Amino acid sequence: MIDSEQLKQHMVKAVEEIRATNPMAGSITNTVTIDFVANAQLAVGGSAAMVYLPDEGEALVAGGGAIYLNMGTLFPIYEQTIPRAAKAAHDAGKPWVLDPVGLGIGSLRTQLVNHRTRQRLRDHRTLRPVGS
């Protein structure tokens, strides 16, 4: 377990690395926070791109260093987009974050999380921590 000073040092190092490399961390995010997410990425020196379509999600993973998947405002197309982007990131060994906003509200959110969990168990792989 790391203490607060170590956490602060890790955060400073991460921001310095981001500013030095300007990585693309794409997002499939909800309409409520899309501006906030993009501005947060830009503020620390990253590059931001937001998409909705499955093929664009896969392309964003291929061209970027990581992807953020937010389930806050789901559109029917996300039933394809989120699993395909997560699988593309997983298969490429790239970090990805699933933000399960509202999990348990409606069947689509639960279905998406269950699908990724089953896929991950079948793959018998673990995700790399961000920055490794």
Language-model features: locations:
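Short acidic loop-to-helix transition motifs that present clustered carboxylates
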Residues: Y52-G57
